[in-house]
Amino acid sequence: MPMFSRFRYIVFTVALLSGPVCAGPRADLSAFTRGLKTLQGHFSQEIIDTQGRVKERSNGTVALSLPNLLRWECDAPYKQLVVADGKRVWLFDPDLNQASVRLQGNEERNSPLIALIDPIQLDLKYDVSEEVAMRDGLRWLSLRPRVGIEASFQSASFGFAQTQLARMELVDNLGQRTVIVFSGWQRNPVFAVDTFRFTPGKNVDVIGDR
């Protein structure tokens, strides 16, 4: 899978959430993100094709900081790194010694993870619903892009366990499903100044416009 496709679900713009509180997973979402400025945790991810076969597994760490900074680092089965520095998105594959770079744009603004960061845009861009029944022991909030919104997914769902975001599931426009399980969240940690910076080495092959 190309590097850009590999990470298109996880690169997003970050902003503060202060949405209305109501019963159910929407309340869980509000509780999870209230007062959020920085966030760090672990993830494991599976990409599943339309036949139900697991195409890819990975795990690693994710860090974000307001207003629009992201670091998504895969540790296994191979190392890869995504850094959104506020202006550009860098994707680095150390095995290939190759980095791809592009401007942050619509893909980030229309990411399903906007649910974590901007409730006004959430309701403007998506039809939001709460699943009535619990699934896998989690309470679920579901999103579908409204007509006219350019998005790389058909639907997205967030699973909460006691106000903690535990899982995200996405179905892309080809019917492929991505399942991301989160754990070990740390709220508002202090990051090193270079956490959200990427500087390619002299011998790194850079593809894209710097």
Curated annotation (Swiss-Prot):
<comment type="function">
    <text>Participates in the translocation of lipoproteins from the inner membrane to the outer membrane. Only forms a complex with a lipoprotein if the residue after the N-terminal Cys is not an aspartate (The Asp acts as a targeting signal to indicate that the lipoprotein should stay in the inner membrane).</text>
</comment>
<dbReference type="Pfam" id="PF03548">
    <property type="entry name" value="LolA"/>
</dbReference>
<dbReference type="InterPro" id="IPR018323">
    <property type="entry name" value="OM_lipoprot_carrier_LolA_Pbac"/>
</dbReference>
<dbReference type="GO" id="GO:0044874">
    <property type="term" value="P:lipoprotein localization to outer membrane"/>
</dbReference>
<keyword id="KW-0143">Chaperone</keyword>
<dbReference type="InterPro" id="IPR004564">
    <property type="entry name" value="OM_lipoprot_carrier_LolA-like"/>
</dbReference>
<keyword id="KW-0574">Periplasm</keyword>
<feature type="signal peptide">
    <location>
        <begin position="1"/>
        <end position="23"/>
    </location>
</feature>
<dbReference type="GO" id="GO:0042953">
    <property type="term" value="P:lipoprotein transport"/>
</dbReference>
<keyword id="KW-0732">Signal</keyword>
<keyword id="KW-0653">Protein transport</keyword>
<comment type="similarity">
    <text>Belongs to the LolA family.</text>
</comment>
<keyword id="KW-0813">Transport</keyword>
<comment type="subunit">
    <text>Monomer.</text>
</comment>
<dbReference type="InterPro" id="IPR029046">
    <property type="entry name" value="LolA/LolB/LppX"/>
</dbReference>
<protein>
    <recommendedName>
        <fullName>Outer-membrane lipoprotein carrier protein</fullName>
    </recommendedName>
</protein>
<dbReference type="GO" id="GO:0030288">
    <property type="term" value="C:outer membrane-bounded periplasmic space"/>
</dbReference>
